[in-house]
């Protein structure tokens, strides 16, 4: 039982410690508790996903990406001030860099596109019914986001 199988809210310190083969007081000692542990994990998980870049097609969010979204949402719920610090916006920054490098876009445009893609993924994972998103539509939305980036890249290079 770990974050791969369950949401962060459903795991206890004892369960996390058992999976990590450590004593549960160690988590509190070294990380200050479950929240601190997850704050340490988020950048590591985000970096692993970000190094892969944007896939050419994206049928649906991977299980790994779903876990990242749920962890991010849980962290935001537990500590609303956490993502106010610009250095903690790891996912947004990674997407911005991908858009800058892949499409040669200005940083401000790349940030907006990264935020749009994050909104799509977060909505698809957390609240697909709120916008009537069908699973097969996710790939169409992703393709549209890439097309928008390509068109913006063409317009900024003129």
Locations of regions flagged by a protein language model:
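Short amphipathic alpha-helical interface segments enriched in basic and hydrophobic/aromatic residues
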Residues: 3, 21, 46, 50, ...
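Helix-turn-helix
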Residues: 4-36, 40
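Amphipathic alpha-helical interaction segments
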Residues: 36, 67-71, 112-119
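Hydrophobic alpha-helical connector segments
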Residues: 40, 45-79
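Short amphipathic alpha-helical segments and their helix-coil junctions
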Residues: 50-62, 91-104
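Hydrophobic/aromatic-rich alpha-helical bundle segments in the mid-to-C-terminal region
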Residues: 84, 88-89, 99-158
């Amino acid at each position: 039982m770990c974050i791969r199988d369950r949401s962060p809210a459903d795991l206890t310190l004892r369960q996390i410690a058992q999976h990590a083969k450590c004593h549960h007081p160690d988590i509190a000692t070294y990380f200050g508790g479950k929240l601190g542990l997850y704050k340490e994990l988020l950048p590591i998980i985000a970096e692993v996903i970000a190094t892969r870049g944007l896939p050419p097609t994206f049928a649906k969010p991977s299980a790994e990406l779903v876990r990242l979204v749920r962890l991010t949402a849980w962290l935001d719920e537990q500590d609303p001030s956490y993502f106010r610090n610009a250095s903690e916006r790891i996912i947004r920054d990674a997407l911005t860099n991908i858009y800058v490098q892949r499409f040669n876009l200005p940083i401000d445009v790349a940030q907006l596109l990264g935020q749009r893609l994050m909104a799509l993924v977060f909505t698809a994972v957390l609240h697909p019914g709120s916008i009537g998103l069908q699973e097969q539509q996710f790939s169409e939305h992703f393709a549209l986001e890439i097309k928008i980036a390509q068109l913006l890249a063409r317009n900024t290079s003129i």
